[in-house]
Amino acid sequence: MDGDVVSVERVIPAGPAAIFALVADASRHPDIDGSGTVQQVKPGAPQLLGLGSTFGMSMHMGIGYSTVSTVVEFEQDRRIAWQTYPVGFLAKFVAGRIWRYELEPTEGGTLVRESWDISQDHQRMLLRLGRLPEKTAANMARTLERIEELVTAP
């Protein structure tokens, strides 16, 4: 963990546009999620995300809960990030983390970097403790594997 950010990266043998189209489609997030917590997009999410887009997710990590996210960074085929807040009681305790994807064309495909940025989270000090950063990095590595599987499938 570099300060308040955990990042993983992988070269995926596909162009940035194909990868970005997958990541910028909130309805596909359950398909790419390597943690198993993202269950389904809530009704009303835009077909493709853009700066300022808001979307909700049904989540499950021990218990079911809902989140709402807003796209806070957007550069077509290069970068997308959304800030996530739980809905309801949990929002008082854990809220504000940013999930970011950065894509760089490279030899053999695209370097994809996923980051978990807790610099604006209400409980960032608590989130740094224990094995959560390590566990999050492992889940993000699985997410990048799933993205590769989906964009390279015949």
Predicted regions and their residues:
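Beta-strand/loop substructures that line and gate deep hydrophobic ligand-binding cavities in soluble
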Residues: 86-138
